[in-house]
Amino acid sequence: HGKGLEFGLWFEPEMVNPDSDLFRTHPDWVLKPTEGRLPMQGRTQQVVDLTNPDAYDYIYDAMDKLVGELGIDYIKWDHNKLVTEAVSPRTGRPAVHQQTLAVYRIFTDLKAAHPGLEIESCSSGGGRVDLGILEVADRIWGSDCVDPVERADIQRYTSLLVPPEMIGEHVGASPAHSTHRATTQELRMAMAFFGHMGIEWNLLKEPQEEIDALAEWVAEFKK
């Protein structure tokens, strides 16, 4: 903040690792088909049952405290594991729809408690991107692939439902980490202009002329 910047922090609030104190203390806070069986893990994770009021309050209170104490301006809400075999142990009923509504409510409650807070629904492959989330989020993340050639199609079809200014579109390094395709900075920057531009690129490794060119593009985007 002292340098005129805003502070963002990356969260993955719906996920819990079975090898964690939270899971060991509250195994009933996880969506699962039966009492004795968990869904298949994804990235060593299971899904917290936000339809359970106690679990909801725990997640909300933890995030609310961090936003207030750290002065967080921007939240990236990640969501990597697919919500499968999602039954709430509390009710014994399918919970995908209610889980989604609970996520909307956390977004709404956090933004009401912290005016000016922005939240990105950052989920690779669109796991937390739908028309409902557009009412409560400030930005969505279309894909972890930032190769501008691939992004042309991603942006094209995502923008059929999502306004371009809400679609995160980043300038990455060349070659791209996801496709290993080498592209010019001009192409990468031009593609980023079709969405909500950002940068995910280790500029400490780049020559000054690349950084200067990037600064010119950024200044143009801000006009």
Q: Where are the model-predicted features located?
A:
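Glycine-centered short loops/turns at secondary-structure junctions
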Residues: 2-4
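Active-site neighborhood of glycoside hydrolase catalytic domains
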Residues: 16, 21-186, 194-201, 205-211
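Anionic-ligand-binding alpha/beta catalytic cores of soluble enzymes and soluble regulatory domains
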Residues: 214
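Carbohydrate-binding surface patches
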Residues: 223
